[in-house]
Amino acid sequence: MAGSGEGMGRRQFLRMGMAAGTVLAGGGEAGARIPAGASPALRARLAKLDEVLKQPVLKRELFRSPVIIESLELLHLDGKYLCRVRSRDGAEGISVAHSTMDRLYPIFLRNLRPFFLGKDARELDLILDKVYIYDFNFRLNGLALGLPLATIEFAILDMLGRMAGKPVSDLIGERQRAEVAVYMATEWREKPVEESLRLIREAVGEHDIHALKIKVGGLMFMTTDMSAVGPPGRTEKIVPLVRKTFGDRMTLYADANGFYELPEALRVGRLLQEYQFAYFEEPVMFDHLEEIRELAQRLPIPIANGEQDYSFYGFRWLLANDGLDVVQPDNYYFGGMIRSVKVARMAAAFGRQIIPHMSGGGLGFFYNVQLVSALPNAGLHHEFKSFRTHVRFDSPTAPLKVMDGRIKVPTGPGFGVDLDPDWVKKHEPVRG
């Protein structure tokens, strides 16, 4: 559907995104159990995914000698955070933390940092598995653990990339594309249709965009008012209006953020299909696995899910049970790129796509395109909100511009961006 609003069914969507890809083996959590009553076909599918999860991601062979993690710092300035890692031999990497680090820094300092110190960074796959066991960290599963864990992983990958003289994409896979096509992600579900449309038009107008995602449903997350509901009939009005406004050449996606119950999700899914939307994201709550599967099997429009997921188990179940078309782990929420690559490889094993969710702010857009550039089964368009950020940096190999709907992927070592050293020096270490 790239560049076209012509309708497409689930199978056609999957074939298009996979055309240039090959199936990869993957790595991650091993030892998930196969239900005793599972059919032979299901047992075979689960076993295939488990085998995929056993394979490593980081290219250890690029580093002949141990890379011992000597220090791991969390730095702050004006309520924003950086992570800086240094090896025993003096190599350094820096990442930009998610905006919620102001609430999660104790987990970084007390639950995660002690486990990483003294470890060989070449063992990053194993470290990311075992840190969940240390200090019963799995009890904190979800964004509370995933966000600080990803922040640490990004800094280590940046360090390793600089040591190897390679971009992060070449550490976790093979560069599949020099540019990543993006869609404009919009919000404003709480606003009337006319105001929403005006804001959507303004957002799209800022960049050379050929794909757009809108919000549907009435998830009122932005208020403490327990009786708050969205504008009546907003979804039914805005879906056809957005198609009419942007025409058939704009690829459209829709995101409900888990708002609907199954019957309403079916109804809205049919509406989206009528107006040639390319997928329906989080139609029901992310962990309602059986409902997600039912939607995927009953609706022709592809179903996307995984932004909120925090373990491999949900993806494993949905993929094994033919219950999901597009996997959407978030680089930050899910605990980093290596874990996200493992999900991508699971999806590839059954011909499914990955379109990662992207957290806004910081350098999330560059982290996301590095990941996507390494994935053979990446979908057609990937999340983008803007280049606005508090971070002071230079991008010598990739301009901050969307050109013909695409962002150039940095090719420099690490994440390919250079933080302003004077700005970094202004940050102070967070004490545990």
Where are these regions (language model features)?
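Metal- or metallocofactor-binding catalytic centers and their adjacent structured scaffolds
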Residues: L46-A47, R88, E92-M163
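Metal-dependent enolase-superfamily TIM-barrel catalytic cores that perform enediolate-based chemistry
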Residues: A178-R298
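C-terminal extensions of enzymes
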Residues: G17-A20, H390-G432
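Shared catalytic-loop signature of beta/alpha-barrel
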Residues: P114, K119, L126, K130, ...
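N-terminal secretory signal peptides and thylakoid transit peptides that target proteins
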Residues: A2-G21
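Glycine-rich, aromatic-flanked loop segments that form ligand/cofactor-binding clefts
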Residues: E153-K191
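Conserved, mostly hydrophobic/aromatic
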Residues: G90, I152, G165, D255, ...
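C-terminal segment of N-terminal export signals and the immediately downstream linker at the start
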Residues: G27-L75, E92
